[in-house]
């Protein structure tokens, strides 16, 4: 006698598990669609708006070059522009007079620190370097190769070297407020001088590393620095006017977070926006990237502390 065929029933727990798996698949598909759409939006741009033709003169006397011929090593455009040229008239106006520039509050704070003795040696910055004006031109050539240390150094790295070896003081954290204020002071006394970062000789390998990072796609959005600041500068994206990502204006006071921001702050934010794990401020990767990006602005004037959105 043939045995009856038993019907196979799915248990309630199995049904719930299958339902959850289906939901996860749908959510993953939807997330992938959103990511693809976001990347496409960045690459396509909502609208095109060329940089304006306004000229920047600070305090009626410091002429800032905001447009010039691209250096020979910049391969994909002929003209370079300061980020100031991509800002609204209202934002641009903050830089015309130091009394209106909120970034100058950091400069004033650094002036006090400049003359303050610290550390086991009881020395101040002024004891070795004199008045801040005597540092005019330093910002224009950093990052630069340090022969004694055998490495490319940013201004922040050099400031900490002075604090530790000459003053016997504790090093500042790379993105500490005091550090960014001090770099803003050093930038302010170099305003109007042309960026002239050296990329040959022993600095070349670091520069090449920075270039590789610049063109590498990162994160879930698979975007590189070049995708925004080279391929799509001038495009409007989420009401923001994409610039060429020049660093001549750093440190930059951002209206968005109401503070001075270092170059590495901005690098970190950009990579984070691609939904990637980011390098740390002061890391060899960001030092290399800063050298490369700074060299792309050779010929533009030192402008920091600048004001941006």
What does each model-found stretch correspond to?
Residues 1-23:
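N-terminal amphipathic/basic-hydrophobic helices that include classical n-h-c signal peptides
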Residues 5-6, 40-106, 143-208, 256-278, ...:
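Post-cleavage N-terminal segment of exported redox proteins
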Residues 17-35:
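Bacterial N-terminal signal peptides that target proteins for export
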Residues 107-109, 113-115:
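N-terminal carbohydrate-binding/catalytic regions of secreted carbohydrate-active enzymes
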Residues 118-133, 182, 210, 220-232, ...:
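The canonical Cys-X-X-Cys-His
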Residues 120-126, 238-241, 307-308:
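Extended intrinsically disordered, low-complexity coil regions enriched in Ser, Thr, Gly, Ala
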Residues 136-143, 237-243:
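Short cysteine/histidine-rich zinc-coordinating motifs and their immediately flanking basic loops
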Residues 188-240:
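Extended amphipathic alpha-helical interaction segments
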């Amino acid at each position: 006698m043939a045995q009856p065929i038993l019907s196979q029933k799915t248990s309630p727990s199995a049904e719930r598990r299958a339902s959850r798996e289906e939901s996860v698949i749908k959510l993953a598909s939807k997330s992938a669609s959103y990511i693809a759409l976001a990347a496409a939006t960045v690459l396509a741009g909502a609208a095109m708006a060329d940089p304006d033709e306004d000229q920047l003169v600070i305090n009626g006397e410091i002429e800032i070059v905001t447009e010039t011929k691209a250096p020979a090593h910049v391969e994909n455009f002929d003209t370079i522009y300061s980020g100031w040229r991509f800002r609204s008239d209202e934002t641009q106006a903050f830089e015309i007079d130091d009394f209106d520039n909120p970034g100058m509050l950091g400069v004033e704070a650094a002036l006090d620190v400049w003359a303050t003795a610290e550390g086991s040696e009881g020395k101040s910055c002024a004891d070795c370097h004199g008045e801040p004006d005597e540092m005019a031109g330093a910002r224009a050539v950093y990052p630069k190769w340090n022969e004694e240390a055998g490495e490319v150094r940013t201004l922040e790295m050099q400031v900490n070297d002075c604090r530790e070896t000459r003053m016997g003081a504790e090093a500042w954290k790379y993105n500490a407020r005091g550090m960014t204020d001090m770099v803003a002071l050093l930038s302010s006394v170099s305003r109007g001088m042309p960026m002239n970062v050296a990329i040959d000789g022993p600095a070349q390998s670091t520069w090449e590393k920075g270039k590789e990072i610049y063109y590498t796609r990162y994160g879930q959005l698979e975007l590189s620095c070049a995708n925004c600041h080279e391929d799509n500068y001038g495009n409007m994206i989420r009401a923001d006017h994409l610039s060429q990502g020049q660093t001549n204006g750093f440190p930059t006071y951002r209206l968005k977070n109401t503070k001075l921001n270092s170059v590495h702050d901005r690098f970190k934010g950009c990579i984070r926006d691609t939904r990637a794990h980011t390098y740390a401020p002061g890391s060899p990767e960001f030092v290399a990237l800063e050298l490369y990006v700074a060299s792309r602005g050779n010929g533009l004037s030192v402008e920091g502390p600048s004001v941006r959105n």
